[in-house]
Amino acid sequence: MLRAARIADANAFPHSTMRCWRYVKQALLQAGAVSGYPSTNYACQAGAELTSRYGFVRLKIHDPYRAPVGSVLVYSGGGAGHVEIRTEHGFASDYRSAWACRYRLIGVYAKLSA
C-alpha cells in the first residue's frame, strides 16, 4: 500500500481535475493492490467495492489524519463523493493536498496483506 501512496502522489496535480476515483484506481492497479480495474463509477462507492472484490478491510479510524500511509479514504458529499490515498505528506487522488477532504468521512480502507 505504500507503493500505491507513492504512485498517487507522483501522478497527482496541484489542483483537482474532478477525477479522484479514476486516479486512485490507477494508483491501486499500478501498485498491484487490486487485481483488476475497479468498475464502480462514483468515489463514494469505492469502499464497498474494495472490500467486496479486492480484500480490503475497513479500519476503525474516524480521523483522516490518523489513517495509515497507503490507506484509502472514502467520503460522501458533492454528489459523487471523494476518495484519496493517505500519503507520507498528506493526501493524494487526482490532486495532492496536505489537508484531508472536508466531506464526511465514510471510511478508511486498507489491504492488510499487501
Outline where the language-model segments fall.
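N-terminal capping segments
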Residues: 1-48
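...with weaker cross-activation on analogous glycine-rich loops/strands in unrelated enzymes
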Residues: 36-104
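C-terminal partner/receptor-binding element of secreted or periplasmic proteins
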Residues: 100-114
